[in-house]
A protein has these predicted regions:
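Intrinsically disordered, low-complexity segments enriched in small/polar residues
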Residues: 68-69, 76, 136-138, 224-225, ...
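Phosphate/anion-contacting hairpin/loop surfaces
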Residues: 80-191, 199
């Protein structure tokens, strides 16, 4: 599943390419699984709207939309009136393509834009979700957990205070931290020198601060390298990321630790494969 760096990379790429465009026409596939809002309503609501901006919230991509009418001035300075929310699920892709680009199998949505390009949602396993929100009728989307890139020391420590669960499981809890998944939990715990089984509520303030900084550093490094392409992930242009080449523990079971040469171990924790160095992580 794409995690925070992958979703951030896609959102930035889409924003750079479609900001200021207007949605001219919408086509949705026949499968109903991706649609949190009924597809007929989504198509009707999306057509004609200006795309004001695209950003990430947690593991979701949020397209900020203006009204369904108005000229070029509104397209650039209009007020957000609606949102189109994309969750990539396990295998989802959000691509900006030429209109005549080969249609990938499992394409569930095509938005034709005023620039002549298309915004396409492709999802082979169909765990992704597409949702439309009219801000005149309800609240905009917000992730339930804290933002790992900006959370401060005190707020970060408070997330884990009294938690009787392993720190790896706590990092994966989207109600605590939005966007952290298996890859970046393993990698940040390695950088911080913390064993994934340690109880979150027993970690001291200095140890948690070390983890906060390591997590932010790992996420920023991954964004800089375009994310981790360990499976289907590609960015908005269909290009793979490179952070998988920097992984220190994730999917390196049995291989020597890059710091101390001790073999990396793999255990099952919180239902997820978990990788760590028994020498470097205490």
């Amino acid at each position: 599943m794409p995690e925070l760096p992958e979703v951030e990379t896609i959102a930035r790429g889409v924003d750079e390419r479609v900001r200021g465009d207007r949605i001219v026409q919408v086509w949705f596939g026949s499968h109903r699984e991706p649609f949190k809002t009924p597809p007929a309503r989504q198509a009707r609501e999306l057509e004609g709207r200006a795309i004001l901006a695209v950003h990430r919230t947690g593991k979701h991509i949020v397209c900020e939309l203006g009204s369904a009418s108005g000229g070029p001035l509104e397209e650039r300075s209009g007020r957000m009136e609606a949102q189109w929310i994309v969750h990539l699920g396990m295998t989802g892709r959000l691509l900006v393509t030429a209109p005549d680009a080969l249609l990938a199998p499992h394409t569930h949505a095509r938005l034709s834009l005023s620039s002549g390009r298309e915004l396409r949602f492709v999802d082979p396993r169909r765990f992704g979700r597409l949702e439309f929100r009219d801000l005149g009728r309800g609240a905009g989307f917000s992730a339930p957990g804290a933002e790992p890139l900006t959370i401060g020391p005190e707020a970060f420590a408070a997330l884990f205070r009294g938690r009787r669960l392993a720190i790896k499981a706590a990092l994966l809890n989207q109600r605590l931290l939005a966007g952290v998944g298996n890859i970046y939990a393993d990698e940040s715990l390695f950088r911080a020198g913390i064993r994934p089984r340690r109880m979150a509520g027993r970690l001291t303030g200095p140890v948690l601060e070390r983890l906060r900084l390591a997590l932010r550093e790992v996420l920023e490094d991954a964004i800089r390298l375009g994310g981790s392409s360990v499976s289907d992930y590609v960015d908005a242009d269909g290009m793979r990321g490179f952070f998988q080449l920097e992984h220190c523990v994730y999917r390196r079971s049995g291989l020597p630790c890059l710091r101390c040469q001790t073999p990396i171990r793999r255990i099952l924790l919180a239902g997820r494969g978990t990788h760590y160095c028994p020498q470097c992580q205490l």
